[in-house]
């Protein structure tokens, strides 16, 4: 269950958000002061934070700075301040979104869902171990395991696999891949890619002639699918 920390000194805002979030399956904790918010976050690290800037004991920007020292969860600022400078300051301090009061609940909840999705996707992409049904890529250990044994890869093969794996599910252009693995001087040497991808498929795919994980996007580049 997604844990939401709501920080606001207006009781009616706290109540409205608690009710609307709870009925949609979120777990909610609230705080009406900056000090209380930092204490609550330390005791129960939230998955997402909703933060008002106008708190009675300290600036919401200071609260944001305190949270950003250790918390990577998305922070949505909810404030009556409409000046562009306030928005810029909050976003520069680490806020992920800025919603002005008064606000529509449906739009706000949509922004909340989007922030949670982005954070979840980013966390998944940062996972150091990627498992497929054919092999496992350990990005931190810089190795690949297949059928219980480590697969020997050359530094170039590993460089190509690593870049594709770190961008899994996304198209990686041929020029981008060449510059990253071989260097800018090789940006047009596309035949290198065909040779090394074929080698990777032979070593990793169960059926190299019908690959499931190391895919070619004709004329564009390559994609890794777990």
From Swiss-Prot:
GO biological process: regulation of DNA-templated transcription
Alphabetical UniProt keywords: Cytoplasm, DNA-binding, Phosphoprotein, Transcription, Transcription regulation, Two-component regulatory system
Primary location group: cytoplasm
Observed effect of gene inactivation: Cells lacking KdpD and KdpE show an increase in virulence in mouse model of infection, with significantly shorter survival times.
MF term (GO), any: transcription cis-regulatory region binding
Processing after translation: Phosphorylated by KdpD.
One GO CC term, this protein: cytosol
Residue ranges for the DNA-binding region feature of this UniProt entry: 127-226
InterPro entries on file: CheY-like_superfamily, OmpR/PhoB-type_DNA-bd, Sig_transdc_resp-reg_receiver, WalR-like, WH-like_DNA-bd_sf
Response regulatory domain residues: 3-116
Annotated positions of the 4-aspartylphosphate modification: 52
Subcellular locations according to the entry: Cytoplasm
Record-linked PANTHER family: KDP OPERON TRANSCRIPTIONAL REGULATORY PROTEIN KDPE (PTHR48111:SF50), REGULATOR OF RPOS (PTHR48111)
Function: Member of the two-component regulatory system KdpD/KdpE involved in the regulation of the kdp operon. Upon phosphorylation by KdpD, functions as a transcription regulator by direct binding to promoter regions of target genes to positively regulate their expression.
Note: Was identified as a high-confidence drug target.
Stated name of the protein: Transcriptional regulatory protein KdpE
Species this chain originates from: Mycobacterium tuberculosis (strain ATCC 25618 / H37Rv)
Record gene name: kdpE
């Amino acid at each position: 269950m997604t844990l939401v920390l709501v920080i606001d000194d207006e009781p009616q805002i706290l109540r409205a958000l608690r009710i609307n979030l709870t009925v949609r399956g979120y777990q909610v904790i609230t705080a009406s002061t900056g000090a209380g918010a930092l204490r609550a976050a330390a005791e129960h690290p939230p998955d997402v934070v909703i933060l008002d800037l106008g708190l009675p004991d300290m600036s919401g920007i200071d609260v944001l700075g305190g949270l950003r020292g250790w918390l990577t969860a998305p922070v949505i600022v909810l404030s009556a301040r409409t000046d562009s400078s306030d928005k810029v300051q909050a976003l520069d301090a680490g806020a992920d979104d800025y919603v002005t009061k008064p606000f529509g609940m449906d739009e706000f909840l949509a922004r909340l869902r989007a922030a949670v999705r982005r954070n979840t996707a980013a966390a998944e992409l940062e996972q150091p171990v990627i498992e497929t049904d054919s092999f496992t890529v350990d990005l931190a250990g810089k190795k690949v395991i297949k059928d219980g044994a480590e697969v020997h890869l050359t530094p170039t093969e590993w460089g190509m696999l690593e870049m594709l794996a770190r961008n899994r599910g996304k198209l990686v252009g041929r020029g981008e891949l060449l510059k990253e693995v071989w260097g800018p001087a090789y940006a047009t040497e596309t035949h290198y890619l065909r040779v090394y991808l074929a080698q990777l498929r032979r070593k990793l795919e169960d059926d190299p002639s019908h690959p499931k994980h190391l895919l070619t996007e004709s004329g564009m580049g390559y994609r890794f699918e777990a």
